[in-house]
Amino acid sequence: MESFLTEIQINVLNLRKRGHTQDEIANIMGTSRANISMIEKRARENIEKARNTLSIYNDIIAPSKIKIDKGTDVFSIPKIIFSKSDQEEIHVNYSSLQIMEFVNQNAQRYIKNRMVVEPFVVTILQNGDIFVHDYEESEENEKMPKKEI
C-alpha cells in the first residue's frame, strides 16, 4: 500500500510502539540514535501533514458544517448536531453520549467549564461521521459565512 511514510519510518514507529528506545532501535538497525530521532521526527511530521490533508478534504466534501459559537453549553452540542443532520437528511453514526465523548476528546481546547470559549466547527460527512476543527481553518477552506446556527 502506498503511504506518506517510508519503510524505515514505519519500522521505527512500530519499534517505538513496542516500547523500544531510540538507542535500542539504532542498535537494531545499525545506525545512530540521532538518525533514528530524525527518522521518527520526519515520520510524525508526515503523519501530521496527512491528518491535515484529510481534514481539508473532509471540509471540502462535507455536506454540512456547524459553527459552535462561543458561549454554547457543551451539553447542547449533540442536539445542535442532530438538528442540523436531520435538516440535511444525514444519519449521524453516534448517540448523544458518544458525541459528548467525541467533543470531550477532540474539542477540549475550545471548552472550559462546560462552556465553549472559542468557536469551532463540527463537520458532518455524508456517511454520518463527524469531525471537529478550528473555525478559522474552516473559513480559510471555504469562506464560510459567519452566522449563528
Swiss-Prot record:
Gene3D superfamilies: DNA-binding protein Tfx superfamily, archaea (3.30.1190.10)
InterPro entries reported in the protein's UniProt record: RNA_pol_sigma70_r4, Tfx_C, Tfx_DNA-bd_arc, Tfx_DNA-bd_euryarc, Tfx_DNA-bd_sf_arc
SUPFAM superfamilies xrefs: DNA-binding protein Tfx
Alphabetically ordered keywords of this record: DNA-binding, Transcription, Transcription regulation
GO molecular function: DNA binding; DNA-binding transcription factor activity
UniProt key word Glycoprotein: no
Gene Ontology terms: biological process: DNA-templated transcription initiation
Similarity-based family: Belongs to the Tfx family.
HAMAP family given in the database record: HTH_type_Tfx
NCBIfam families per UniProt: PRK03975.1-2, PRK03975.1-4, tfx
Known function: Putative transcriptional regulator.
UniProt protein name: Putative transcriptional regulatory protein MMP0086
